[in-house]
């Protein structure tokens, strides 16, 4: 009972709990729908379920860590991201594969996402004095992913794959452009380098608590929303082909 009371009084831990339940519920939904999904889109929906399942497991441990220590579970969060974000990038390859997406595109997306996350972790945890440099490197990798999705190979292949894929790719692109933009903000607020050397907040601990809440909400929206777009695509594309 004490454990539950602490969770209800701790807004950060409470959002970790909500995140765990939301991610797990989404995973169950995606996995159960696999039998109702055509073979063409089954892998994409499976990956969506894996993304939310991996996140649910990590959120369970992040909540426990936060309750026990009161600290932000930065390490566990990056472990989650380094597993789930590349999988989110894989989705772009999977949905454009029928238009001729090459394996090289898959590796570009995965490599860029790993560079973005590893450099972010180094700047936020291992080399905080050099956080500006690491943040810039992470940002370059992020904008490279944005370029591929909005103007590069992904965008061109999506147009060739048909109107349903093109529409879904655009929605997913907005998740990357807008939804993922919250994470650099957390990096800026939580590192001594701030915004190119300008510390934006005086109470970093309070900022990190606030950003944990924002991260948790953003993670749920981004990961579950990403999967729902893929799921909707699997339904609308099949319906269009049967019409």
Language model features with spans:
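Hydrophobic transmembrane alpha-helical segments in integral membrane proteins
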Residues: 1-23
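Hydrophobic alpha-helical transmembrane segments of multi-pass membrane proteins
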Residues: 22, 44-62, 181-189
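Alpha-helical transmembrane segments in multipass membrane proteins, preferentially the mid-helix core
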Residues: 25-29, 90-91, 119, 141-163, ...
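Internal transmembrane alpha-helix with an interfacial aromatic "cap," most often the third helix
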Residues: 27-33, 78-125
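Membrane-interfacial loop-to-transmembrane alpha-helix junctions, especially the N-terminal start
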Residues: 39-49, 101-109, 169-172
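Helix-loop junctions on the outward
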Residues: 55-78, 121-127
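Extracellular-loop-to-transmembrane junctions of the mid-late helices
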Residues: 125-151
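C-terminal transmembrane-bundle signature of multipass membrane proteins
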Residues: 148-151, 171-243
């Amino acid at each position: 009972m004490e454990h539950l009371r602490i969770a209800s009084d701790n807004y950060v831990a409470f959002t970790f709990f909500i995140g765990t339940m939301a991610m797990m519920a989404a995973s169950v939904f995606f996995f159960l729908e696999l039998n109702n999904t055509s073979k063409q889109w089954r892998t994409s929906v499976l990956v969506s379920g894996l993304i939310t399942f991996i996140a649910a497991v990590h959120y369970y441990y992040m909540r426990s860590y936060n309750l026990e220590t009161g600290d932000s579970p930065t390490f566990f969060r990056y472990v989650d991201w380094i597993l789930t974000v590349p999988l989110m990038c894989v989705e772009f390859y999977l949905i454009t594969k029928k238009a001729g997406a090459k394996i090289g595109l898959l590796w570009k997306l995965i490599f860029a996402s790993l560079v973005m996350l590893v450099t972010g972790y180094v700047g936020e945890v291992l080399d905080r004095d050099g956080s500006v440099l690491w943040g810039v490197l992470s940002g370059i990798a992020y904008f490279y992913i944005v370029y591929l999705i909005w103007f590069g190979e992904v965008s061109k292949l999506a147009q060739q794959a048909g109107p349903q894929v093109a529409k879904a790719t655009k929605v997913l692109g907005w998740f990357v452009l807008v939804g993922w933009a919250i994470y650099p903000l957390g990096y800026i607020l939580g590192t001594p380098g701030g915004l190119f050397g300008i510390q934006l907040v005086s109470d970093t601990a309070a900022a990190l608590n606030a950003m944990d809440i924002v991260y948790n909400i953003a993670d749920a929206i981004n990961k579950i929303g990403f999967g729902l777009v893929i799921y909707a695509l699997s339904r609308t594309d099949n319906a269009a082909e049967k019409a």
